[in-house]
Protein backbone atom coordinates (compact mmCIF):
# COMPACT_ATOMS: atom_id res chain seq x y z
CA UNK A 1 0.00 0.00 0.00
CA UNK A 2 1.38 3.39 -0.93
CA UNK A 3 0.24 6.84 0.06
CA UNK A 4 1.75 10.19 -0.88
CA UNK A 5 3.99 10.38 2.19
CA UNK A 6 5.43 6.91 2.62
CA UNK A 7 5.43 3.29 1.68
CA UNK A 8 3.76 0.95 4.16
CA UNK A 9 4.31 -2.77 4.50
CA UNK A 10 1.72 -5.50 4.91
CA UNK A 11 2.82 -9.08 5.61
CA UNK A 12 1.44 -12.58 5.98
CA UNK A 13 3.37 -15.31 7.79
CA UNK A 14 2.42 -18.94 8.36
CA UNK A 15 4.28 -19.48 11.64
CA UNK A 16 3.79 -23.28 11.49
CA UNK A 17 2.37 -24.51 14.81
CA UNK A 18 2.88 -21.70 17.30
CA UNK A 19 1.41 -23.63 20.21
CA UNK A 20 1.80 -23.19 23.95
CA UNK A 21 4.26 -25.66 25.48
CA UNK A 22 2.88 -29.03 26.57
CA UNK A 23 2.88 -30.17 30.17
CA UNK A 24 5.47 -32.89 30.76
CA UNK A 25 3.87 -36.26 29.91
CA UNK A 26 3.50 -38.91 32.60
CA UNK A 27 4.85 -41.46 30.14
CA UNK A 28 6.96 -40.67 27.08
CA UNK A 29 4.39 -42.34 24.80
CA UNK A 30 1.45 -40.30 26.12
CA UNK A 31 -0.15 -38.04 23.49
CA UNK A 32 0.45 -34.31 23.86
CA UNK A 33 -2.05 -31.47 23.65
CA UNK A 34 -0.15 -29.84 20.78
CA UNK A 35 0.42 -33.06 18.90
CA UNK A 36 4.11 -32.12 18.66
CA UNK A 37 6.95 -34.21 20.06
CA UNK A 38 8.91 -32.76 22.99
CA UNK A 39 7.14 -29.41 22.70
CA UNK A 40 8.43 -27.80 25.89
CA UNK A 41 9.00 -24.27 27.21
CA UNK A 42 12.50 -24.09 25.72
CA UNK A 43 11.35 -24.98 22.19
CA UNK A 44 8.33 -22.67 22.48
CA UNK A 45 10.51 -19.72 23.59
CA UNK A 46 12.94 -20.45 20.77
CA UNK A 47 10.08 -20.44 18.24
CA UNK A 48 8.83 -17.07 19.54
CA UNK A 49 12.37 -15.70 19.28
CA UNK A 50 12.74 -16.92 15.69
CA UNK A 51 9.42 -15.40 14.64
CA UNK A 52 10.30 -12.04 16.22
CA UNK A 53 13.74 -12.24 14.57
CA UNK A 54 12.10 -12.53 11.12
CA UNK A 55 10.37 -9.22 11.78
CA UNK A 56 13.60 -7.69 13.08
CA UNK A 57 15.20 -8.62 9.74
CA UNK A 58 12.28 -7.04 7.86
CA UNK A 59 12.73 -3.89 9.95
CA UNK A 60 16.45 -3.78 9.15
CA UNK A 61 15.86 -4.41 5.45
CA UNK A 62 12.89 -2.07 4.93
CA UNK A 63 13.54 0.47 7.71
CA UNK A 64 10.05 -0.25 9.03
CA UNK A 65 7.88 -3.02 10.35
CA UNK A 66 4.72 -4.03 8.50
CA UNK A 67 1.78 -2.01 9.78
CA UNK A 68 -0.46 -5.08 9.32
CA UNK A 69 0.64 -8.69 9.81
CA UNK A 70 -1.59 -11.67 9.12
CA UNK A 71 -0.49 -14.81 10.95
CA UNK A 72 -1.61 -18.41 10.62
CA UNK A 73 -1.18 -21.64 12.58
CA UNK A 74 -1.45 -20.04 16.00
CA UNK A 75 -3.03 -21.80 18.96
CA UNK A 76 -4.74 -19.29 21.20
CA UNK A 77 -4.23 -15.70 22.34
CA UNK A 78 -1.30 -16.14 24.76
CA UNK A 79 1.45 -16.81 22.17
CA UNK A 80 0.34 -13.68 20.30
CA UNK A 81 0.40 -11.56 23.46
CA UNK A 82 3.89 -12.84 24.25
CA UNK A 83 5.09 -12.20 20.68
CA UNK A 84 4.01 -8.54 20.56
CA UNK A 85 5.87 -7.84 23.84
CA UNK A 86 9.16 -8.90 22.22
CA UNK A 87 11.57 -6.89 20.07
CA UNK A 88 10.94 -5.45 17.54
CA UNK A 89 7.24 -5.02 18.42
CA UNK A 90 7.81 -3.79 21.99
CA UNK A 91 4.10 -3.71 22.88
CA UNK A 92 3.39 -1.23 20.05
CA UNK A 93 1.24 -3.79 18.23
CA UNK A 94 -2.30 -4.86 18.92
CA UNK A 95 -3.71 -8.33 18.33
CA UNK A 96 -6.98 -9.42 16.74
CA UNK A 97 -7.66 -13.10 17.33
CA UNK A 98 -10.61 -15.45 17.81
CA UNK A 99 -10.48 -19.09 18.88
CA UNK A 100 -11.71 -21.19 15.97
CA UNK A 101 -13.45 -24.55 16.02
CA UNK A 102 -10.60 -26.13 14.05
CA UNK A 103 -10.02 -29.70 15.23
CA UNK A 104 -6.34 -28.95 15.93
CA UNK A 105 -7.11 -25.61 17.58
CA UNK A 106 -5.27 -23.75 14.80
CA UNK A 107 -6.24 -20.11 14.34
CA UNK A 108 -5.38 -17.04 12.28
CA UNK A 109 -4.69 -13.58 13.68
CA UNK A 110 -3.89 -10.02 12.73
CA UNK A 111 -1.19 -7.91 14.37
CA UNK A 112 -1.41 -4.18 13.77
CA UNK A 113 0.68 -1.11 14.55
CA UNK A 114 -1.39 0.74 17.14
CA UNK A 115 0.12 4.10 16.16
CA UNK A 116 -1.06 3.79 12.54
CA UNK A 117 -4.13 1.55 12.52
CA UNK A 118 -7.56 2.12 14.03
CA UNK A 119 -9.61 -1.07 14.28
CA UNK A 120 -13.20 -0.41 13.27
CA UNK A 121 -14.52 -3.98 13.51
CA UNK A 122 -13.49 -7.61 13.30
CA UNK A 123 -15.22 -10.96 13.17
CA UNK A 124 -14.40 -14.60 12.56
CA UNK A 125 -16.04 -16.30 9.59
CA UNK A 126 -16.67 -19.91 10.57
CA UNK A 127 -17.31 -22.79 8.17
CA UNK A 128 -19.16 -26.02 8.91
CA UNK A 129 -19.19 -28.83 6.39
CA UNK A 130 -21.89 -31.48 6.11
CA UNK A 131 -21.41 -34.82 7.78
CA UNK A 132 -23.76 -37.65 8.64
CA UNK A 133 -23.59 -37.10 12.39
CA UNK A 134 -25.71 -34.74 14.47
CA UNK A 135 -23.32 -34.65 17.44
CA UNK A 136 -21.68 -31.17 17.46
CA UNK A 137 -18.46 -32.76 18.72
CA UNK A 138 -18.18 -34.49 15.35
CA UNK A 139 -18.84 -31.49 13.07
CA UNK A 140 -16.42 -31.10 10.21
CA UNK A 141 -14.94 -27.65 10.76
CA UNK A 142 -11.84 -25.83 9.67
CA UNK A 143 -9.97 -22.77 10.88
CA UNK A 144 -11.85 -19.50 10.70
CA UNK A 145 -11.26 -16.70 8.24
CA UNK A 146 -10.63 -13.42 10.06
CA UNK A 147 -12.37 -10.38 8.59
CA UNK A 148 -11.29 -6.94 9.80
CA UNK A 149 -12.19 -3.37 8.93
CA UNK A 150 -9.41 -0.97 9.85
CA UNK A 151 -8.65 2.67 9.17
CA UNK A 152 -5.26 3.94 8.06
CA UNK A 153 -4.65 7.66 7.35
CA UNK A 154 -8.38 8.21 7.01
CA UNK A 155 -8.79 5.35 4.50
CA UNK A 156 -10.90 2.28 5.25
CA UNK A 157 -9.19 -1.07 4.59
CA UNK A 158 -11.05 -4.39 4.52
CA UNK A 159 -8.88 -7.43 5.28
CA UNK A 160 -9.38 -11.17 5.17
CA UNK A 161 -6.75 -13.29 6.95
CA UNK A 162 -7.04 -16.69 5.28
CA UNK A 163 -5.35 -20.03 5.89
CA UNK A 164 -7.09 -22.55 3.68
CA UNK A 165 -7.41 -26.27 4.49
CA UNK A 166 -4.32 -28.21 3.47
CA UNK A 167 -3.71 -30.21 0.29
CA UNK A 168 -3.18 -33.58 1.95
CA UNK A 169 -4.56 -37.08 1.58
CA UNK A 170 -5.20 -36.88 -2.17
CA UNK A 171 -6.53 -33.37 -1.79
CA UNK A 172 -9.61 -34.38 0.19
CA UNK A 173 -10.00 -30.72 1.22
CA UNK A 174 -10.30 -29.28 -2.29
CA UNK A 175 -14.12 -28.91 -2.08
CA UNK A 176 -13.69 -27.06 1.23
CA UNK A 177 -11.10 -24.70 -0.23
CA UNK A 178 -13.28 -24.08 -3.29
CA UNK A 179 -16.31 -23.30 -1.10
CA UNK A 180 -14.34 -20.95 1.15
CA UNK A 181 -12.75 -19.10 -1.77
CA UNK A 182 -16.12 -18.70 -3.50
CA UNK A 183 -17.61 -17.34 -0.27
CA UNK A 184 -14.75 -14.86 0.21
CA UNK A 185 -15.11 -13.70 -3.40
CA UNK A 186 -18.83 -13.06 -2.81
CA UNK A 187 -18.05 -11.14 0.38
CA UNK A 188 -15.42 -9.02 -1.40
CA UNK A 189 -17.83 -8.17 -4.22
CA UNK A 190 -20.36 -6.93 -1.63
CA UNK A 191 -17.89 -4.54 0.03
Which positions does each model-derived feature cover?
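N-terminal, active-site-proximal structural segment of metallo-dependent hydrolase catalytic domains
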Residues: 1-86, 90-92, 96-102, 106
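Beta-strand-turn-beta hairpins that frame and shape the catalytic cleft
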Residues: 2-10, 22, 116-117, 140-162, ...
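A short local loop/turn or secondary-structure capping micro-motif enriched for an aromatic residue
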Residues: 20, 128-131, 167-169
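Short capping/connector residues at structural and topological boundaries
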Residues: 23-24, 122, 169
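Soluble or luminal CAZymes and related metallo-dependent hydrolases
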Residues: 43-51, 140, 176-183
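Structured beta-strand-rich core segments of catalytic domains in phosphoester-bond hydrolases
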Residues: 70, 74-156
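Extracytoplasmic, non-cytosolic globular domains
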Residues: 152-191
